[in-house]
Swiss-Prot record:
GO molecular function: rRNA binding; structural constituent of ribosome; tRNA binding
Biased composition annotated in UniProt, kind: Basic residues: 99-113
PROSITE patterns: RIBOSOMAL_S13_1, RIBOSOMAL_S13_2
Any one Pfam family match given in the protein's UniProt record, by short name: Ribosomal_S13
GO cellular component: cytosol; small ribosomal subunit
Keywords, sorted A to Z: Ribonucleoprotein, Ribosomal protein, RNA-binding, rRNA-binding, tRNA-binding
Lineage: Bacteria, Pseudomonadati, Pseudomonadota, Alphaproteobacteria, Rickettsiales
Complex and partners: Part of the 30S ribosomal subunit. Forms a loose heterodimer with protein S19. Forms two bridges to the 50S subunit in the 70S ribosome.
Functional note: Located at the top of the head of the 30S subunit, it contacts several helices of the 16S rRNA. In the 70S ribosome it contacts the 23S rRNA (bridge B1a) and protein L5 of the 50S subunit (bridge B1b), connecting the 2 subunits; these bridges are implicated in subunit movement. Contacts the tRNAs in the A and P-sites.
Region described as Disordered: 99-123
Protein name: Small ribosomal subunit protein uS13
Family affiliation: Belongs to the universal ribosomal protein uS13 family.
Length: 123
């Protein structure tokens, strides 16, 4: 496994697909990384030379926020929303959907919590 951005990316996959295993890198950013480093998108990670891997690492380090830094940034943004007491922050605090989804019948995953016990059928 090649180690890029603190993540072991799979060797048997194409470079564009393997880069998406890194948190914060989607398909469009993976394409941009390949173009910026001058690497063919369809080549497998196992076929990359060590200097190609170093190019990719340097490109990501220079211009992308990924993995732990990105997770920390997202958590700080959510904490900021909760601290200022805006509507989105209140929804986060109550563990309800934030983006306007209905909650009367849905949102079971986000709400979590207790389930009502179903009474056993009478025979």
């Amino acid at each position: 496994m090649a180690r890029i951005g603190g993540v072991n990316v799979p060797v048997d996959k194409r470079v564009v697909v393997a880069l998406t295993y890194i948190y914060g890198i989607g398909t469009s950013l993976a394409n941009r990384i390949c173009e910026g480093c001058g690497i063919d998108k369809n080549v497998r990670v196992s076929a990359l030379s060590e200097e190609d891997v170093v190019k990719i690492r340097n490109f990501i380090r220079a211009g992308c926020v990924v993995e732990a830094d990105l997770r920390k940034e997202v958590a700080m943004n959510i904490k900021f929303l909760m601290d200022i007491g805006c509507y989105r922050g209140l929804r986060h605090r109550k563990k309800l959907p934030v983006r306007g989804q209905r909650t009367h019948t849905n949102a079971r995953t986000r709400k979590g919590g207790s389930r009502l016990a179903v009474a056993a059928k009478k025979k």
